[in-house]
């Protein structure tokens, strides 16, 4: 249970970081 929870937490964190980086690059290109 704890392993699955930590795994999904890590996956969610990775997805959030990836989205943040993608949005940042998009804003830099728009400027």
Swiss-Prot record:
Residue stretches spanning the membrane: 4-24
Localization: Plastid, Chloroplast thylakoid membrane
Keyword Plastid included in the entry's annotation: yes
Membrane topology reported for the UniProt record: Single-pass membrane protein
Keyword Chloroplast: yes
Any Pfam family hit: PetL
Domain of life: Eukaryota
GO biological process: photosynthesis
Listed HAMAP family: Cytb6_f_PetL
Family in the record: Belongs to the PetL family.
Functional description taken from the UniProt entry: Component of the cytochrome b6-f complex, which mediates electron transfer between photosystem II (PSII) and photosystem I (PSI), cyclic electron flow around PSI, and state transitions. PetL is important for photoautotrophic growth as well as for electron transfer efficiency and stability of the cytochrome b6-f complex.
Name of the protein described by the UniProt record: Cytochrome b6-f complex subunit 6
Species per Swiss-Prot/TrEMBL record: Eucalyptus globulus subsp. globulus (Tasmanian blue gum)
